[in-house]
A protein has these predicted regions:
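RNA/tRNA-interacting regions in translation and RNA-turnover enzymes
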Residues: 1-148
Length: 148
């Protein structure tokens, strides 16, 4: 950050950005109601439709071998949850949000749990939200059912 303040985006994004900075873990969020079909994290074959936030309305499809969250309509996030797309972006009108904390280092699993718990508490406290599902996805526990 080099001494520069982090700008405000929206209440939900600001909350997960604060937790991301506190725990030094990647966090993200998407509009769950904008998903088409199931969300999957996978290595892409390339060509998944994706319009990135902040760069106009140009389709920028995934590349072969890229790791991305995808649904039946295309890419939701690219490079894990780093590059958000327009189609599923959180807005002031989002009714059901998908918030994610990522951690690929098994040594930091407790940090991941703590970040997830703190994010849930802040979202409930400051946004009046109800947490429907809070699960840790691992190699041995590979999926969660999320129903808005």
């Amino acid at each position: 950050l080099k001494g520069n303040p982090v700008g405000s985006i929206s209440p939900s994004v600001d909350l997960y950005n604060a937790i991301s900075l506190k725990y030094a873990l990647p966090l993200g969020g998407e509009d769950l109601d904008a998903f088409e079909g199931d969300l999957r994290l996978r290595i892409t074959e390339g060509g998944d439709a994706f319009t990135p936030l902040g760069e106009g309305a140009e389709n920028d499809p995934t590349l072969p071998g890229e790791l991305a969250y995808v649904d039946d309509a295309g890419a939701v996030c690219r490079c894990w949850n780093w590059r958000d797309g327009v189609r599923t972006a959180l807005t002031d009108n989002t009714g059901n949000a998908f918030l994610i904390v990522e951690c690929v280092d098994p040594e930091r699993i407790e940090d991941c749990r703590a970040a997830t718990e703190e994010l849930a508490q802040l979202v409930e406290q400051h946004l009046g939200a109800t947490i429907a599902v809070a699960e840790l996805i691992t190699y041995d526990h590979r999926e969660a059912i999320i129903e808005p």
